[in-house]
A protein has these predicted regions:
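Nucleotide-activated chemistry modules centered on ATP-dependent adenylation/adenylyltransferase
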Residues: 1-53, 122-132, 136-364
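Accessory substrate-recognition/RNA-binding modules or partner subunits associated with SAM-dependent
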Residues: 10-112
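Short, contiguous clusters of charged residues that form electrostatic/catalytic patches at enzyme active sites
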Residues: 76, 113, 117, 182, ...
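Short, hydrophobic/π-rich interface segment
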Residues: 100-131
Length: 364
């Protein structure tokens, strides 16, 4: 029988993660906490492992074969699995993790030594051989020994890490460009459940921003989403328009009384310092707790964006070079447009499906 094993990230609460996995994948037969990992029995290990790689709070995900923890049986099963995953001419390494709660009359090194010997004999014809260390190995076999059963990992995948989604409560954020999308992804990785404000100038802007929101739900594996669709009006063009958009959106975030925490897509390399000071001061003045996940990123911001599929030029296009007197000149317009936008806001509660883009646009 194949199972899915989730290895929690360093700061994840194991019991909270178990609940999050059950909510995200209700089709799982069971979720068992085995000290340093969670073993999930599944009727479709491949599909459920794929979905688990999108969950925050998980560092790695493995599809594993559930086997007997008896020493002789375990070593034989490791060798059997190894013949299927070790490539001809490759070096391999077997690593065994025995959970603290497991009670067996052998230690990790016993399993690794015996199983390596058996596997070497079986793979002699294809000239595969054991490596001296995990670092030197071309193929790696991880074995987890639990309280009752052992698990031989067949396939390993990376997951996003971070803190269990929703464990830090909810936060209000806006998606209206690459920076705001990256801010939302970082906030989600920090354990927040996001209510998304989706501001837009016109139909084309709505399509662009909804496409970015779709990236968010895809990357985070979101199944249900709250959206505040908010039409905004900016008459100016160029740099002034960028500045006014950010200030109006910040004002709207500050004005929503149902949310005490907000995410601000501020970055020291993209926004002038006076603007960052102003936006944060106004948020605090409005009795909000502002979070700015990208604030001090520079070169690493570009690298992170590229991982998500955002190009460097898209980030640079959001650079604002407005002068401080712009705010004094446009402050009344910002306040007025924010009030109008809030009155025209439409709340959506969505079940995220394959037609997400059309579902959002049609609902608005």
């Amino acid at each position: 029988m194949n199972v899915v094993i989730a290895f929690p990230s360093a700061f994840a609460n194991t019991h909270g993660l178990a609940k999050a996995i059950k909510r995200a994948i209700p089709a799982l037969t069971s979720v068992i906490i085995e000290d340093s990992c969670l073993v999930c029995e599944s009727t479709d290990a491949v599909e459920h492992a794929s979905r688990m790689t999108k969950l925050f709070g998980i560092d790695r995900v493995a599809i594993a074969k559930k086997v007997s923890s008896r020493f002789s049986d375990l070593c034989a099963e490791i060798a059997k699995v190894g013949t299927k995953i070790v490539m001809p001419g490759h070096s391999f390494y077997i690593r065994t993790i025995i959970q603290q709660s497991a009670r067996h009359d052998y230690v990790s090194r016993d399993v690794e030594f015996a199983a390596s010997g058996m596997l070497t004999a079986r793979l002699a014809a294809i000239k595969a051989h054991p490596a001296k260390s995990e670092k030197d190995a071309q193929d790696f076999i991880l074995v987890v020994v639990g309280q009752k059963w052992a698990y031989v990992c067949i396939q390993m995948s990376n997951a996003p890490g971070g803190i269990v989604a929703g464990s830090q409560g909810s936060v209000l954020a806006s998606i209206h460009g690459p920076l705001s999308l990256l801010s939302c992804l970082n906030a989600a990785k920090g354990g927040f459940e996001l209510v998304i404000m989706l501001p837009y100038f016109d139909e084309e802007d709505l399509k662009r921003n909804t496409a970015l929101a779709q990236v968010f739900v895809t990357k985070t594996g979101t199944r249900k989403q709250k959206i505040l669709a908010t039409p905004i009006n900016v008459r100016e063009k160029g740099t002034i328009a960028l500045f006014l958009r950010e200030m109006i959106i910040s004002e709207i975030l500050n004005s929503h009384s149902n949310y005490n925490r907000i995410v601000l897509p501020l970055n020291i390399a993209v926004h002038p310092l006076w603007m960052i000071d102003l936006v944060i001061r106004e948020a605090v003045s409005a009795k909000k707790t502002p979070f700015a996940p990208l604030l001090f990123m520079s070169e690493e911001l570009i690298s992170y964006a590229q991982v998500v599929g955002i190009q460097e030029q898209e980030i640079l296009s959001e650079t604002i070079q407005a002068k401080e007197d712009f705010f004094r000149k446009y402050s009344r317009i910002i306040e007025y447009e924010a009030k109008v936008a809030i009155k025209r806001t439409k709340r959506l509660d969505l079940e995220v499906g394959p037609n997400y883009l059309h579902d959002v646009i049609d609902s608005i």
